[in-house]
Amino acid sequence: MPDSIKKNWFLLGLVAVVLFTLTDTRGILTGPGLWLKAHHGPDFVIILIFFLSGLVLDTSRIRAGASDYRGTLAALSLIFLIAPLLTLPFTLLDLSTGVLLGLFLVAVMPTTLSSGVVMTGGAGGNMAHALLITIVANSLAVFTIPFTLGILLSLTGDNRIIEIEQLPIMLKIATLVLLPLLAGMIVRRTSTALRPFLPYTGILNQIGILAMVWMALCRGREAIVSDLGTVLPILGVTFSFHLALVLAGMVIAHYGAIGKGRRESVIIMGGQKTLVLSVILQVSLFPEYGVALVVCVLHHIVHLIMDAFLTRHLKGKK
């Protein structure tokens, strides 16, 4: 297998899942996907993903990055404040409610659980600090997402958008994300039985994300197929949004005197957004807006490609 395929199999898998599911007119793929979705398949996959993520997180390394208070605050500001604010200009464009909703879901997400840490290391940054940002951001997301998303939804001007109930969302995120993540971290520290499987957790996680996207696409296939003309505008929106977020991170790092070795974790972790949690909320709260799922998936593909170039740029920058 060529090295390029080995390195990019997840991105290729995302593209394949989207194409095969949307072109499945006989129900060969969508039938099983709909059955699994109706029988708590997504919940099981989500719990497994975050449990495995907890197994991988080496909490003993967090102390090494805990002293960088300025960098941590800068990254969290990018994740929870600046990212939602950067969606405001897009509300002035002639975008459909589904596209705006997808962008809002992306913007309120915490940082990724794995790729951001790896890319920070590849850029010459502090991986321990990136890990700290990951854990803090995903813990805070339980409380920030319901409030921020509720505010952004009020900007759509579409009365069909339901008002979300904040407490149920908090409980859902805590149950499906935070508790499995903590359980995995505890098992890692207290047991050695699963350590032989640690090298494979990243692959299993990515397979789980592909399964989540597949089940969600099965549910929203009809709505997506009927609105395929929005794909190019979505690519433009997701590219512009992530570019703006990365540039904001660079500006904050520059004026905050966060130099080389520290700025990488701020810029990369502040700009990356987890896919799986956005899929959870789209499937749970807005299944009728299938195009919102397309925004989440395309943003993930676009921002990983952009960040691969960003990693090289930051590594060579003094």
State what each model feature region is.
Residues 1-318:
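Alpha-helical transmembrane segments of multi-pass small-molecule/ion transporters
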